[in-house]
């Protein structure tokens, strides 16, 4: 018989105040004869926001363990709008069913394919150890406070399936399950399992067909000795799962799992092969890959990522190969870019919403230093905060991106001057410091496509503020009097590696917008670009050659609406498509207008040449624009100029 004190659950659950120690992830709780799901506030709502409660069905609750959550205190309140919240006096405790049949013997022999159904608690070694070449049918029951992995499946051993709950188990690798052989489907509830070396709940060196269930509050038990000898002790990561073998599919919920050291992977660290990952990842944390770190191969990720955090890749860090990310949501992740790619990714089709980079390091949504074939979806409300010049918007590209087919709406950068009088944001410095609130590209070409659809780039801006309080995670807006620059895209002529001490390259970057099958791009925010040091004297600002060309291409049916300035472009080519200038009023009342400019207000000569070919159409909207200043002009192939008079 196990008493509740022996279960080791007093820390996060038993008799704890909700606002203090309830796990940060969503938790399902039974109160009386009803079942509820408790979802924590996301970081952007502030530290004082309340937990949201939703009633769920018995099937969703689906607890098959001999313990249950019990509400104590005054319980639930309802506000005027009908939202249900916990009262401030409410707290939880866990009751263990002491009448349950608790197993005290350790299974350490071949079960000849038979099933095991029992409750295991307090074992000093593996509760179930399947020897080499051993066979077990299905394992069910509950594993609470066992040591040295609750289930050990050895080399060439087989377990047909596991449907059990694992609470507060601990081992060096794989607190709940350590697999060297083959396991069919794994499902259940994994709470508060720990490891020192990685895979706090599941450590896989063999083959697992599917993994499902819930992984809540699994965390590393990293010791002083382990910190001193990480290479010897093989410390990796994986707050819930560390995979070095093969896994067919993972479809589960991961809440508040943590691995703070080495490769990270707050929920999953993959060093093997995973075919598919689905589910929801909430409030997981790691040094890299707040939810997932991939160092080898994943075929498909289709999941939701909320409020995960890391210094590198707040939701996902990829150093291997991911074939496709689709139908995914990255929202309210914080600390760095939601997706960090230093490997290869085929396609990304996702929504990136309100992700926050408050750690002074580059991007808020995607930082690409590898290869991405294509990006589609929506980037909205992503924010980057910085104390210096290293803040560059929703997407930063320092590698290769094949094409982008996406909307960029209301993404922003805030650069703080720390309140010092000598922190001068001159035009030259501003180009390096902020710019590209939607996308910044380092030494790499960019291509945007709109095939039979209308894409928008609007509401993106850079704010040079005077706020003194650095936003560690959630960010604050700059004080009044800050300067707003409505800039969406910035093309840097030098590479990201050269940013600290730039050596400007004689390379013309190419920015392409391709509109076909009636598709269009509407751009309401400015496009800007770096300059190159032609004479290699180290003073690029003295030269007049500019660092990017813009190509507008199509099949004769598309349109690019430029309600913004095209700054510092060398040559703009319109090829079998329409470029239409118009104007746009931003939320702060600023009016932007289509045009070509140097970006300086000192009377410099025009720097941009326009080339029209293959039935190109340049449409000037003369209600606001009566002059276009160009360095050069060429027209051929039945191209025409459209002027409203």
Where do the model's predicted regions map?
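Glycine-rich beta-solenoid repeat tracts in large extracellular/virion proteins
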Residues: 9-21, 32, 50, 70, ...
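Extended, beta-strand-rich, solvent-exposed assembly scaffolds of outer structural proteins
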Residues: 26-44, 51-60
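Fold-core signature of tandem repeat domains
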Residues: 128, 136-139, 143, 151-155, ...
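Short, structured coil/turn linkers that connect adjacent secondary-structure elements
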Residues: 12, 41, 142, 146, ...
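All-beta strand scaffolds that present successive hydrophobic residues in beta-strands
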Residues: 2-6, 17-20, 31, 79-80, ...
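Extracellular beta-strand/loop-rich repeat segments of large surface/secreted proteins
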Residues: 1, 468-472, 483, 490-498, ...
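Acidic, glycine-anchored loop motifs typical of Ca2+
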Residues: 75, 538
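Predominantly extracellular beta-rich ligand-binding scaffolds that present long acidic/polar faces
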Residues: 165, 188-190, 258, 277-281, ...
């Amino acid at each position: 018989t196990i008493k509740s004190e022996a279960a080791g659950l007093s820390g996060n659950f038993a008799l704890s105040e909700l606002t203090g120690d309830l796990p940060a992830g969503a938790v399902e709780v039974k109160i009386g004869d009803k079942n509820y799901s408790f979802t924590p506030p996301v970081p952007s709502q502030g530290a004082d926001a309340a937990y949201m409660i939703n009633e769920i069905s018995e099937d969703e609750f689906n607890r098959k363990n001999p313990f249950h959550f019990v509400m104590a205190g005054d319980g639930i309140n309802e506000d005027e709008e009908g939202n249900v919240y916990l009262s401030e006096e409410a707290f939880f405790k866990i009751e263990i069913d002491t009448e349950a049949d608790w197993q005290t013997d350790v299974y350490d022999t071949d079960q000849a394919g038979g099933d095991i159904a029992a409750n295991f608690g307090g074992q000093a070694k593996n509760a179930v150890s399947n020897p080499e070449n051993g066979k077990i049918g299905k394992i069910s029951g509950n594993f609470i406070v066992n040591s040295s992995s609750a289930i050990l499946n050895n080399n060439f051993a087989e377990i047909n399936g596991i449907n059990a709950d694992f609470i507060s188990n601990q081992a060096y690798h794989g607190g709940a399950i350590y697999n060297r052989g083959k396991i069919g489907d794994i499902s259940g509830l994994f709470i508060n399992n720990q490891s020192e070396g990685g895979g706090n709940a599941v450590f896989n060196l063999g083959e697992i067909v599917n993994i499902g269930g819930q992984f809540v509050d699994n965390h590393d038990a990293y010791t002083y000795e382990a910190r001193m000898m990480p290479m010897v002790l093989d410390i990796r990561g994986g707050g819930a799962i560390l995979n070095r073998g093969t896994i067919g599919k993972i479809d589960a919920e991961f809440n508040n799992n943590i691995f703070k050291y080495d490769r990270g992977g707050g929920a999953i660290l993959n060093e093997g092969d995973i075919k598919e990952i689905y589910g929801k990842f909430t409030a997981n944390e790691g040094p890299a890959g707040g939810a997932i770190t991939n160092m080898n191969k994943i075929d498909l990720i289709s999941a939701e990522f909320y409020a995960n955090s890391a210094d590198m890749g707040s939701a996902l860090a990829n150093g291997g190969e991911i074939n496709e990310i689709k139908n995914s949501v990255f929202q309210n992740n914080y600390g760095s870019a939601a997706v960090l790619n230093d490997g290869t990714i085929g396609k990304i089709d996702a929504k990136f919403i309100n992700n926050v980079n408050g750690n002074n390091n580059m991007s808020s949504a995607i930082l690409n230093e590898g290869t991405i074939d294509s990006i589609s979806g929506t980037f909205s409300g992503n924010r980057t905060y910085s104390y210096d010049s290293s803040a560059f918007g929703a997407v930063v590209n320092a590698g290769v991106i094949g094409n982008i087919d996406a909307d960029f709406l209301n993404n922003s950068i805030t650069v703080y001057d720390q309140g010092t009088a000598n922190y001068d944001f001159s035009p030259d410095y501003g180009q390096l410091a902020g710019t590209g609130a939607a996308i910044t590209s380092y030494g790499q070409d960019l291509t945007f496509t709109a095939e039979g659809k209308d894409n928008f780039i609007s509401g993106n801006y850079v704010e040079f503020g005077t706020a003194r309080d650095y936003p560690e995670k959630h960010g604050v807006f700059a004080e009044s009097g800050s300067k707003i620059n409505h800039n969406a895209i910035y093309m840097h002529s030098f590479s990201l590696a050269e940013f600290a001490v730039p050596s400007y390259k004689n390379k013309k970057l190419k920015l392409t917008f391709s509109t076909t099958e009636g598709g269009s791009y509407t751009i309401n925010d400015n496009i800007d670009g770096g300059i190159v040091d032609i004479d290699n004297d180290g003073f690029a600002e003295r030269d007049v050659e500019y660092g990017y060309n813009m190509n507008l291409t199509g099949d004769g049916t598309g349109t690019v609406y430029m309600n913004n300035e095209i700054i510092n472009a060398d040559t703009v080519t319109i090829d079998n498509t329409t470029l239409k200038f118009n104007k746009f009023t931003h939320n702060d009342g600023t009016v932007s207008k289509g045009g070509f400019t140097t970006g300086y207000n000192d009377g410099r000569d025009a720097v941009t040449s326009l080339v029209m070919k293959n039935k190109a159409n340049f449409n000037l909207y003369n209600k606001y624009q009566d002059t276009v200043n160009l360095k050069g002009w060429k027209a051929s192939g039945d191209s025409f100029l459209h002027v409203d008079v």
